[in-house]
Amino acid sequence: MKTIAIVGGGITGVTTAYALAKRGFTVTLFERHRYAAMETSFANGGQLSASNAEVWTHPSTIIKGLKWMLKSDAPLLVNPKPSWHKISWFAEFMASMTAYEKNTVETAKLAVAARQHLFAWAEAENIDFDLKKQGILHIYRDKKGFDHAGKVSEMLAKGGLPRHAVTPDEMKAIEPTLAGKYYGGYFTESDSTGDIHKFTNGLAQAVKRLGVRTLYDQNVTDIQSDSNQVTITVAHTDAPTSIHTFDSVVVCAGVASKQFASQLGDRVNIYPVKGYSITVNLNDAESQAGAPQVSLLDDETKLVTSRLGDDRFRVAGTAEFNGYNRDIRADRIKPLVDWVNQCFPKINTRSVVPWAGLRPMMPNMMPRVGRGKAANVFYNTGHGHLGWTLSAVTADMVAEVVSAQASAERATIISGSTNLARVST
């Protein structure tokens, strides 16, 4: 197993390419856009947030979804139109509720472990991605939300992540620009933020230096495996269809992973959960002074923030179950702008760039990392809202699995050669 294809050039695909190239594999990366990180990894919330490791498989999620179903500006919006994909996903989601605490603890462990890889890679490759190590402040507007956060903190502690409660006065000291009245907060000093798009593109340049063949504008339409060889079909708008063969493949294709897994005989029940963001351009001194330096997560509105350099302020959130729909809806963007005006009144929101992306979410909220049914098929996908946070550690994990598989194959070949030698003497 020497040649490996990676399908998908977002954060998980590029980090996987890096982890494999560093282990000496010959890697080819396929991406359907002209550049890396042009879909889900383009303009997310920016948080590297182990403190947001709580999985969504909690009864309150279903209750809120039903309550907000007819509210177009709700943080969680479910299109009531049924589909087998949506029904099966929610059925598995509810079945996963028994593992709520276990999966939250495990996600926290992964998120903490991911930091050392991501920061080390950024330093080794000299990648500037507006990294800010100033912690993340979770804010709560009522006692109910704050009390639930206390229970979540106990689970995060089991996963190796300490965070502490703060009073409204302490919240103001942590982030003086935050306006409004709050019940309390939780502050995680070890969390950080950064620009996922800048990091992914910086690492994409690094993998090229390591010898990875990066193929952009490549619309992969089919992947097949006979367990010995992988065949990838690529459609082109201005050229005939091309066929490529490799020893193995790692599927890192975001919401398209479900389709490719089906072609390969695997079931990866990812649902595309749309999220929105706005990037506020801080074009004047008052806006720059009035924007927060510390990253925030508002529990009531489910919005997160990141300060990206001096002149950009990112606000992101919402979860929309509406199929493979990438439309940017004005009624979903307006609550984000209104939130900025309410919480940070000194920011001028005249210049705002809206964006929407599809999070690849598994029903149990845990990424699919590891081998498929075929011995030469692997997955690193389904990270949901924590792709940026978890990408480095899952890339390292899947690279270890691939390396172990390759070592086992080499051992089999050596063993077979030894046996043949004994027979012939």
Task: List where the protein language model places each region.
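N-terminal Rossmann-like FAD-binding beta1-loop-alpha1 element of flavoenzymes
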Residues: 2-29
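Glycine-rich FAD pyrophosphate-binding loop
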Residues: 22-42
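Dinucleotide-binding Rossmann-like beta1-alpha1 core, especially the glycine-rich loop
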Residues: 43-167
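Helical element adjacent to the flavin cofactor pocket in flavoenzyme catalytic cores
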Residues: 147-159, 178-240
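Active-site substrate-recognition segment that forms the wall
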Residues: 44-47, 52, 56-95, 220-230, ...
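Short beta-strand to alpha-helix junction loop
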Residues: 102-115, 138-148, 173, 186-205, ...
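C-terminal catalytic lobe of FAD-dependent flavoproteins
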Residues: 163, 299-300, 325, 341-425
